[in-house]
């Protein structure tokens, strides 16, 4: 510790150093020449009053500064809690199933039947279908106008299913004619050998009658149940069942579309709808989708297997047959046990689908009204308008599974009851979004959540007003664009209807042209006949011939039908041009509306786009609004502190350390100063130096003289210093002399060591070196948290700021939870108190202290 000496004078006019004595010094005989004499105990007691005042002033300043900081935190935390509460409410609202959700699905105007069956599409997760699962339906009693040209769901089913199998499978020629003969399969009970015999009267084997069919072109012979083939004109020519009713013939299909477990739906989009007429009180079911359809379910012989215990075992048989050329396809026999099986059409022969992973077989079973069934692997089947050559795997199915569905699936009768209608207008329709309807709500960038979040943010921070304006502007703009888009869609659909009418007229005109060509051919034949019979001098009406007139020679019928068709075609052309022109105008207006620049809205939109890029993966959820609000809040609340800290950091480590050391020195030496001692010393200096004490006093307490140096003393000549030392030594004892310090020499020594710099840098270097380090200790102090303004720990300061924010949020949350619990406890106590008082009141009423009721007495 550096000793500090005060220099003054004695009444004799000789200056003597007034020293601060150590703790062991006693008041000796030389104390009469000193202005005061005391030890540490008396010093502490005398400086107590000033220390208390300093502490009180420091506490007041710290409380004011803390209050200012708390004000920032209170405002910020209030806004943060407001945003969190708003976000929680919006999150809860978005997750609720709304009973009446106003969607973009719309029905308005008149419902007319439409023949545009290509508006019906396949929806589902299967490849080739639209990956969309939203559907709705409800009952209505609206009147609908349908005609014979109204498309049904059955037509679309045949088209879509056939397209799926036609595009997924390989073309086949299995629908050619077969030369078949009836055979019997005879087997002995003792062996697994079966003989194939040609007979006229066939008998059943394994529950079926059998045919041996030969396809000469492919050198292929198949042994097949009679139920799978159809005879042609009571001859030996047979074809697979269903070939005449289908136009697509395929084989080797992917297993995925043969399991019978993959669902799809045939759906439409507004302004088209599907209607199923129930015929009960003129009500109909209207929706955007028809019933669920499973891929792989056959048209005929549908059977449903239910129950846990189902087992099928292969019966291995050796088929003994005559010599043959090419391929001989033998049947695969099964014995199955079905505990619960249903025939959909009450047919004696049923078809079920047995499958495992990557393998499937269609079993044709004989329904014998018992749990034991004889089955054979089916060779052919019909799905939609596709005729399939069903797979026949060589490996038997071990892990057997059976498809389970309702008999109404893929039912032709039910699909034919669903008809396609089209509305002429678009109006909002309340649709239930509960789980039983299957309507799934999609989050939207600019919806109720966006508007509410923008309004809340606008009340919290001024920057969010721009976003709210953008949200409202974009909502109106999008609504206008949607209206124009609906008009474009309606006009386009109307134009397509008109084009369809034109196509029908063109088809009729083509038929008429074909008829005219036939008439010309007939006329040519007549001409040739006239030439043969020698008809001469003929006109277009009369012919002079010797042969009688024959009515079969032909007639030329005049008709005005062609002129009517031409007139209708011209009218339709005009309507199509008008409709398409209106659609083009609406589309242009939609693009103009959507691309109309708005300076404020465009700025906000760009800002929103940048924020969306900064926060990837959040999408259009409510988290985007909350994160945006938190970022803006942190930016506004932390930017002043960040800028202030940056300014202090860039101002240099010297000034930061200097302020830190000043504050530390002030707190360290405040308790050692004494008001009474200082006053006595000032009086002594005033009497000895003739007024120079005031100057010394000002210098001591000046801003640049805080470390105990005296510039007045430094400016005096060194001889004056020596004279003071010489005269002072004669008035102090040896003990006190040993404790006299030389502050000037110490200070000069440090000044010389500082390289001629100003005294402030020297004192800074002195203080840091006395603490045992250099300028890099500032960084250590910053990391330890002992430095108020860190010089190199700015990232650490930011991290601790984030930790403090999280801690304060958690603290406010816990305090809020405590308040809620306290309110709940008070409420429960109030309820219990009310119940107690009511019970007490009732009890007192029923059992009063003094009874005024006199009981009757019987004498």
From Swiss-Prot:
**What GO terms are given for molecular function?**
structural molecule activity
Give the propeptide segment as residue ranges. Answer: 1-6
The residues exposed to the Extracellular compartment are 7-614
Ranges for the region named Fusion peptide are: 446-466
UniProt keyword annotations, A-Z = Cleavage on pair of basic residues, Coiled coil, Disulfide bond, Glycoprotein, Host cell membrane, Host membrane, Host-virus interaction, Membrane, Transmembrane, Transmembrane helix, Viral attachment to host cell, Viral envelope protein, Virion, Virus entry into host cell
- Record keyword Metal-binding present: no
**Entry superkingdom:** Viruses
Post-translational modification, as annotated: Specific enzymatic cleavages in vivo yield mature proteins. Envelope glycoproteins are synthesized as an inactive precursor that is N-glycosylated and processed likely by host cell furin or by a furin-like protease in the Golgi to yield the mature SU and TM proteins. The cleavage site between SU and TM requires the minimal sequence [KR]-X-[KR]-R.
According to UniProt, residues marked as the site described as Cleavage are 444-445, 684-685
Residues bearing attached sugar chains per UniProt: 40, 112, 141, 148, 186, 214, 233, 244, 340, 368, 399, 406, 411, 483, 490, 550, 557
Q: Name one Pfam family in it.
A: EIAV_GP90
Q: Which residues lie on this side of the membrane: Cytoplasmic?
A: 636-859
Q: Where is this region: Immunosuppression?
A: 498-513
The membrane-spanning stretches of this chain are 615-635
Q: Which GO terms describe its cellular component?
A: host cell plasma membrane; membrane; viral envelope; virion membrane
Recorded coiled-coil stretches: 576-624, 663-699
BP terms from Gene Ontology: symbiont entry into host cell; virion attachment to host cell
Q: What does this protein do?
A: The surface protein (SU) attaches the virus to the host cell by binding to its receptor. This interaction triggers the refolding of the transmembrane protein (TM) and is thought to activate its fusogenic potential by unmasking its fusion peptide. Fusion occurs at the host cell plasma membrane.
The entry describes its oligomerization and partners as:
The mature envelope protein (Env) consists of a trimer of SU-TM heterodimers attached by noncovalent interactions or by a labile interchain disulfide bond.
The protein's name is Envelope glycoprotein
What's the source species' lineage?
A: Viruses, Riboviria, Pararnavirae, Artverviricota, Revtraviricetes
Task: Give the encoding gene's name.
Answer: env
């Amino acid at each position: 510790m550096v000793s500090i000496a005060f220099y003054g004078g004695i009444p004799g006019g000789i200056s003597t150093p007034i020293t601060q004595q150590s703790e062991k010094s006693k008041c000796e005989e030389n104390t009469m020449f000193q202005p005061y004499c005391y030890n540490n105990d008396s010093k502490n007691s005398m400086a107590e009053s000033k220390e208390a005042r300093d502490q009180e002033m420091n506490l007041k300043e710290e409380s004011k500064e803390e209050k200012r900081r708390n004000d920032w935190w209170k405002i910020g935390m209030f806004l943060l809690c407001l945003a969190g509460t708003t976000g929680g409410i919006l999150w809860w609202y978005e997750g609720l199933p709304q009973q009446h959700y106003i969607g973009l699905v719309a029905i308005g105007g008149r419902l007319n039947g439409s023949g545009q069956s290509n508006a019906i599409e396949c929806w589902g997760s299967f490849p080739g279908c639209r990956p969309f699962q939203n559907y709705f339906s409800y009952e209505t009693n609206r009147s609908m106008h349908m005609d014979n040209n109204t498309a049904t769901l059955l037509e679309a089913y045949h088209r879509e299913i056939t397209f799926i199998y036609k595009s997924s499978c390989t073309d086949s020629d299995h629908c050619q004619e077969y030369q078949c003969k009836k055979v019997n399969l005879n087997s002995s009970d003792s062996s697994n050998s079966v003989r194939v015999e040609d007979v006229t009267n066939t008998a059943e084997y394994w529950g079926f009658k059998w045919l041996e069919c030969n396809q000469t072109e492919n050198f292929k012979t198949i042994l097949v149940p009679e139920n799978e083939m159809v005879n042609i004109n009571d001859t030996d020519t047979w074809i697979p069942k269903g070939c005449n009713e289908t136009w697509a013939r395929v084989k080797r299909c992917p297993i995925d579309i043969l399991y019978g477990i993959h669902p799809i739906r045939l759906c439409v989009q507004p302004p088209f709808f599907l209607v199923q007429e129930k015929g009960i009180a003129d009500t109909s079911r209207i929706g955007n989708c028809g019933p669920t359809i499973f891929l792989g379910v056959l048209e005929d012989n549908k059977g449903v297997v239910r129950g846990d215990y189902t087992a099928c075992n292969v019966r291995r048989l050796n088929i003994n047959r005559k010599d043959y050329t090419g391929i001989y396809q033998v049947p695969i026999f099964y014995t199955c046990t079905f505990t619960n099986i249903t025939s959909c059409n009450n047919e004696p022969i049923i078809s079920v689908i047995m499958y495992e992973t990557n393998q499937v077989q269609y079993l044709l079973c004989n329904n014998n009204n018992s749990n034991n069934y004889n089955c054979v692997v089916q060779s052919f089947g019909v799905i939609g308008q596709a005729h399939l050559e069903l797979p026949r795997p060589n490996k038997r199915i071990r892990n057997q599974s059976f498809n389970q569905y309702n008999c109404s699936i893929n039912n032709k009768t039910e699909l034919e009851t669903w008809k396609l209608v089209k509305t002429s207008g678009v109006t909002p329709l309340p649709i239930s979004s509960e789980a039983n309807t299957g309507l799934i709500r999609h989050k939207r960038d600019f919806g109720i959540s966006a508007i509410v979040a923008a309004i809340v943010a606008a009340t919290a921070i001024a920057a969010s007003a721009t976003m709210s304006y953008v949200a409202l502007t974009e909502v109106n703009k999008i609504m206008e664009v949607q209206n124009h888009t609906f008009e474009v869609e309606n006009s386009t659909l109307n134009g397509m209807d008109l084009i369809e009418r034109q196509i029908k007229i063109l088809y009729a005109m083509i038929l008429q042209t074909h008829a005219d060509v036939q008439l010309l051919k007939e006329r040519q034949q007549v001409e040739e006949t006239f030439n043969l019979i020698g008809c001469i001098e003929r006109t277009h009406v009369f012919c002079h011939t010797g042969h009688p007139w024959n009515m079969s020679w032909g007639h030329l019928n005049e008709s005005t039908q062609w002129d009517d068709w031409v007139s209708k075609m011209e009218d339709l052309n005009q309507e199509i041009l008008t409709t398409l022109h209106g659609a083009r105008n609406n589309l242009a207006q939609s693009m103009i509306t959507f691309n109309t620049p708005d300076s404020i809205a465009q700025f906000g939109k760009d800002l929103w786009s940048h924020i969306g890029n900064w926060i990837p993966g959040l999408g259009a959820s409510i988290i985007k609004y909350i994160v945006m609000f938190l970022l803006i809040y942190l930016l506004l609340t932390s930017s002043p502190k960040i800028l202030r800290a940056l300014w202090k950091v860039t101002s240099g480590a010297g000034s930061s350390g200097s302020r830190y050391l000043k504050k530390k020195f002030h707190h360290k030496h405040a308790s050692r100063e004494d008001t009474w001692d200082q006053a006595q010393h000032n009086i002594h200096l005033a009497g000895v130096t003739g007024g120079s004490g005031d100057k010394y006093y000002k210098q001591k307490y000046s801003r640049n003289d805080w470390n105990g140096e005296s510039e007045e003393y430094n400016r005096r000549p060194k001889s004056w210093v020596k004279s003071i030392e010489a005269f002072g030594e004669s008035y102090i004892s040896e003990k006190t002399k040993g404790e006299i310090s030389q502050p000037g020499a110490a200070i000069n020594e440090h000044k010389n060591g500082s390289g001629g710099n100003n005294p402030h840098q020297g004192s800074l270097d002195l203080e840091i070196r006395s603490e045992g380090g250099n300028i890099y200790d500032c960084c250590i102090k910053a990391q330890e948290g002992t430095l108020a303004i860190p010089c190199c720990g700015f990232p650490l300061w930011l991290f601790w700021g984030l930790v403090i924010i999280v801690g304060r949020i958690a603290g406010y949350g816990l305090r809020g939870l405590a308040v809620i619990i306290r309110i709940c406890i008070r409420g429960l106590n109030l309820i219990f108190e009310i119940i107690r008082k009511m019970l007490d009141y009732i009890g007192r009423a029923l059992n009063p202290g003094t009874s005024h009721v006199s009981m009757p007495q019987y004498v």
